[in-house]
């Protein structure tokens, strides 16, 4: 069993303006809850500078942030699958890059999993 508790996969397509803020929210949430975590950004060949932002976050947070650079645009589902293949956490969560998911809601998902013993 992995020592990483939570893998958070974020498919990225033109998320240059949101992914730093999203990572900061995830980082704060996981540290507050004392979760050992990893964030896997999967860049799906958008047309903005998302990959440069991912590289910068990865440099600041080695061992926590992983960037996957897809060779072309494969679509959101395939980007998620690429992230799942890289994930090492006991639990895997997917989040969109555009801040529509609040990292605090991760607790609701984990509580539901524990109360129902869901996969």
Kindly label every feature range from the protein language model:
Residues 1-119:
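Structured catalytic core of nucleotide-sugar glycosyltransferases
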